[in-house]
Amino acid sequence: MPLNKDIKKVLVIGSGPIVIGQAAEFDYSGTQACEALKSEGIEVVLVNSNPATIMTDKEVADKVYLEPLTLEFVEKVIAKERPDSLLAGMGGQTGLNLAVELHDSGILEKYNVKVIGTSIASIKEGEDRELFRDMMNRIGEPVIKSEIVTDLTAGLEFANKIGYPVIVRPAYTLGGSGGGIADDEEQLRTILESGLQLSTIGQVLLEKSVKGWKEVEYEVMRDSYGNCITVCNMENIDPVGIHTGDSIVVAPSQTLSDKEYQMLRTASINIINAVGIEGGCNVQFSLNPNSFEYAVIEINPRVSRSSALASKATGYPIAKLAAKIALGYGLDEIKNAVTQKTYACFEPTLDYVVVKIPKWPFDKFFGADRELGTKMMATGEIMAIGANFEQAFLKGIRSLEIGKYSLDHNKFKEYSISKLKSIVMKPDDERIFALAEMIRRDYMIDRINKITGIDMFFLEKIKWIVEEEQRLKLSKIEDLDKEWLHHLKKKGFSDKAIADMLKVSPDDVYRLRDIWSIKPSYKMVDTCGGEFEALSPYYYSTYEQYDEVEVSNNKKVIVIGSGPIRIGQGIEFDYASVHCVKALKKLGIETIIVNNNPETVSTDFDVSDKLYFEPLTEEDVLNIIEKEKPDGVILQFGGQTAIKLANFLKEQNIVTLGTTADQIDMAEDREKFDELLERLGISRPKGKGIWSLEEGLEEAKRLKFPVLVRPSYVIGGQGMEITHDEEELTYYLENAFAKDSKNPILIDKYLMGREIEVDAISDGENILIPGIMEHLERAGVHSGDSVTMYPSQNISDKIKADVLEYTKKLALAIGIKGMINIQFIEFEGELYVIEVNPRASRTVPYISKVSGVPIVDLATQVMLGAKLKELGYGIDVYKEPELVSVKVPVFSTQKLPNVEVSLGPEMRSTGEVLGVGRNIKEALYKGFVGAYMYPSKEKGKILATINKHDKAEFLPIAKDLASVGYKFIATSGTCALLKEAGIEVEEIRKIDEEEPNILDIVKNREVDLVVNTPTKGNDSKRDGFLIRRAAVERNLGVITALDTLRAIADVELEKFDENKDLEVFNIAK
């Protein structure tokens, strides 16, 4: 039992939906913490609104509540479960803020719940900018000259006093939200207004900018007896001024002298002792590169993105140990899981280099402002391990899946040196390639060091890589001797990079390696630099020393992971990979995971029998397959990242379980797929590929507007649009053909129908559909951005029977063994197929949890030859549950400047929440509250600007909202419509009219909700865009689909916010 005998039942708060700044790392830390508590015999109650996580599986905690993370709902859970303790530091900023609110509102005291681990007082000292600064002054730790402000005037006065540039850091926000660097008064006004609104306590710290100093982080652990250790120190290649989540980070630090290292280590220990941390904590410093002067930037008094990285970089499980410390254990009483001999009070030592590179979402958002600053914009990250910096760095570049295998980037070849210089000085996501191009043109690296603040050590390494690339370009394959090739491999060059420079194929380089037997050896991550024998099967490749892998003769399967989190391919795929591994283990099969994402559960070293932390490229994966010789490889659960390897593995004669390359081709190749549907007698929306504007207008006439247009090769609906007339279509096609004239544009009849989706399992004879899901928004909104309902609410028995029949026909005709995802449209009583994915999709975790069918487990067994009839869940459609569950998308558009907010066929959401209720309206209410979409309890003002196609549909919704007390403000057209219907409305001037106009009332937050249905193709598109952006940046709700507004109105009519009897449901029953 734990040392503190009073702890029997602990409430753990999760981090909610995935947003930029708070991603899968909290699923990893939360899962670890729950398992650590359970291993001590403690009852664990979990509340988290995110259904896509492993953490919310019924095996992870004893009671699981997928409920909104708000005071009212968490209080309901506490009242029902009566936990004696609360563990706050596992749910990121969301969990921390909620714990502070529960304490301040008296709820914890009312139910007699103690906070274990880091106390609320310590959290406040770490998070409240003023308390933290005062404490630093008390213990003599230097902080940057700063001022706490709570209004605009005080901020402008302070900036004038200390001089620009100044850094703005709001209190209690996530990923630097609302912060930034202001170079002048105008910029400061904008950033400060946003920061004061986003801070939960309306407090912002303004500090003198030390842009250009080094940024260094220490990950520190402390127990309640005051024992402290530093787990890992990390150095950002990018200097202060770029958020650490958007920086390339290296561990351990490469450029600190021993004196600097010890000085900052001592400071971190002083700080966490003073704050009184019990558990893990991250301390960030800025260090003057030219002296020993340093300053404390901030601390995170909880597990964080950096602690997930430190855990994976060292093999030291920070979250697990933080949970044990919360129970009263000391660091000297907890065994190191990797060595089983040493204790947690041993500081890890690293005999390798780790590099983390962020993954940004700009491929989804062409118009976005890509400049990096103190506000985080990356959705995910990759990590790479190497024997030296160059190796880890080049592995990292090819792990990003941006089609780059070296530092050579065609885009920058055309740029002038002055243009390259401006990119490097105002960095964006591609700055590293611009920097390499400058070096390629013999720009002096000491001058690059002066303009960027990047340390000479890193610039020298990058220069070496660029020089080798140039040397290869001037050589032929005959010039490549054994020594040179071996040296390039040691430094991380891939076969493809070498081949591209030599203008030969990667196979040619591979053959040379084979002849000279230049093969990778795999080293173990062992926490102790090889001093003790390690038991962790956690490996990375190098071309250096001897091999540490023991290859068994057992039956074994390799599961390919999904790589970094991005829009369209999120944590859902990690969920599927982990469940696949668990299913294989139950069958007694040795499991091996290959993945490169440090935030996820799949890369926790005790999930699989072996973990290879490697890039998911053809070469890196093949090396592991050749080493391990598995009985099969599973690609179905790793999203597009894994599916992309199918053809390559087929060419190498490697067995893939479940889906084959030919089956993928049949579903993804438009012509083959059309032929298949024709043969099976299944309808799809009419359409074809067109090659010119004239042909497009002709086809649209034949199909009749509206039509759906999109480029032919896309993922996540990139570049799709619905056009309503010739003007809109012409505008789209002119732009599309200007961007790419080599491929056709697909044009389909747009059916304004109901969208239906299924994830099914097929064994080649029968299929099982765990549940038929219905989308709330009509077709045309990407399935990942739609509210999804299960059981379906409006689908007739006839259509359900058609869904089953079509799914069965398709699965059997394609020859699926395992998973298939199909999307349908029901239009005027007919069913049409719009898309088939022969793999797990992003709805798998949701439908698994709400139907109770362990989809991935069953699909894995089927891939290995089991039949559905033997597995205990029947065939065809599984029985529907009593409760209704909705999945509501969550967006991070606020964090990405200049990005479109309106919903359409291109996916934009980063995460999701679940709402569970006795009926659909109850479920929707909880879903909207959990996704922060529910308008305020005080029925406020709605700003409505509705386009001409939508006015008739908008009117009855407006009447309902007016009946519960909402007031309307609208521009002339919508205003006339509402007045005529007898709805009270105030008219507001349009953007191009005199002030105060529509934009001013949004900027001054004089409304509570903006309803704007976008028009396309003309200038009002820009007006609508400006209004939507202004609203999102000021934390106002924005709704662009009337189906969503209809649902909100239905929920409002029920007056749930006055109803105190809403139940919370434990889904682990």
From Swiss-Prot:
Segments for region (Carbamoyl phosphate synthetic domain): 550-932
Q: Which Gene3D superfamilies match?
A: 3.40.50.20, ATP-grasp fold, A domain, ATP-grasp fold, B domain, Carbamoyl-phosphate synthetase, large subunit oligomerisation domain, Methylglyoxal synthase-like domain
Q: Report if keyword Repeat is assigned.
A: yes
- Keyword Nucleotide-binding listed: yes
Q: Where is the MGS-like domain?
A: 932-1069
Comment on bound cofactor: Binds 4 Mg(2+) or Mn(2+) ions per subunit.
Q: In which pathway does it act?
A: Amino-acid biosynthesis; L-arginine biosynthesis; carbamoyl phosphate from bicarbonate: step 1/1; Pyrimidine metabolism; UMP biosynthesis via de novo pathway; (S)-dihydroorotate from bicarbonate: step 1/3
Binding residues for Mn(2+) 4: 835, 837
Superkingdom of source: Bacteria
Record GO biological process: 'de novo' UMP biosynthetic process; glutamine metabolic process; L-arginine biosynthetic process
Give positions of region: Allosteric domain. Answer: 933-1069
HAMAP family, per database record: CPSase_L_chain_A (MF_01210_A), CPSase_L_chain_B (MF_01210_B)
Family membership noted in the UniProt record: Belongs to the CarB family.
UniProt protein name = Carbamoyl phosphate synthase large chain
The organism's lineage is: Bacteria, Bacillati, Bacillota, Clostridia, Eubacteriales
What is the gene called?
carB
